Amino acid sequence: RSLQADRAIVDALKRAGARVTFGSGHLLTVGCAEERLRGFEFDATDCPDLFPALAALAAFCEGVTVLRGTTRLTHKESDRAATIAAEFSKLGVSIDLSQEDRMVIRGLSTPDDGLTVRDASLDSHNDHRIAMATAVASLRADRPVTISNAQAVDKSYPQFWNDLKQLYY
């Protein structure tokens, strides 16, 4: 049991239809419990640092995801709500911020869909969590993507790029 607010990611994954199991040594394994992940509702007010990762998850869920708590995002390393919407839109992900304190994300229609890149030049805005979330979302892009200021990940996860390469390639 973690005291970290970010542990709520487990609940979000389950709401999306993921199967989450815990192993020894704090190992967490995530797989699809259903044929495809589905849009979900989640209140991230108490865990605002999860928004970038939740946006990446929602991009690959069928249907609409509603994340609450966006007012907590304006004073992070970047205005995270606006940054997430701007950078993910370059990947073809529709994010609506017009509802008060909500981020509404329209996911891909089928699990075989890839992201249709509109602009292959993303920017982390020197925000480590934005850099990691856009990198993960870019794995399903229909063409190569570059992320400016990608070294921002060094703030919290210096091994991120090596670990992502090992997991994905």
Task: Please annotate each region the language model reported.
Residues 1-169:
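Short, structured segments at the rim of ligand-binding sites
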